[in-house]
């Protein structure tokens, strides 16, 4: 799991038994896969188009879910644990860390 540069931009991927799968929502211009847990949930950041700011994503059971921190211009997930708690960074006029999980959201300054 990680990302590669194709000469123009980055794209997330998952490597499993020498087989590589691109991890990127349909239509996205770029992605970064940054974390994975033991339930195979992958988290990271993608840009919906070349002019867009980054949005966080989760990828689980072949489904992408996008996430934008409230009032943020940029959001990314960096890690996820086995409970589905996610850590990330966001820009809301300044850079903040945050922790999000099922039913909660906590900003860290």
Where are these regions (language model features)?
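Residue-level hotspots at or immediately adjacent to binding/recognition sites across diverse folds
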Residues: 1-109
């Amino acid at each position: 799991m990680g990302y590669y540069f194709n000469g123009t931009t980055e794209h997330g991927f998952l490597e499993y038994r020498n087989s590589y799968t691109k991890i990127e929502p349909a239509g996205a211009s770029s992605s970064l896969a940054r974390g994975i847990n033991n339930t195979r949930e992958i988290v990271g950041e993608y840009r919906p188009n070349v002019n867009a700011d980054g949005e966080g994503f989760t990828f689980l059971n072949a489904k992408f879910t996008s996430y934008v921190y409230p009032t943020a211009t940029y959001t990314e997930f960096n890690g996820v644990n086995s409970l589905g708690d996610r850590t990330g960074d966001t820009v809301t006029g300044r850079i903040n860390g945050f922790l999000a999980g099922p039913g909660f959201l906590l900003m860290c300054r």
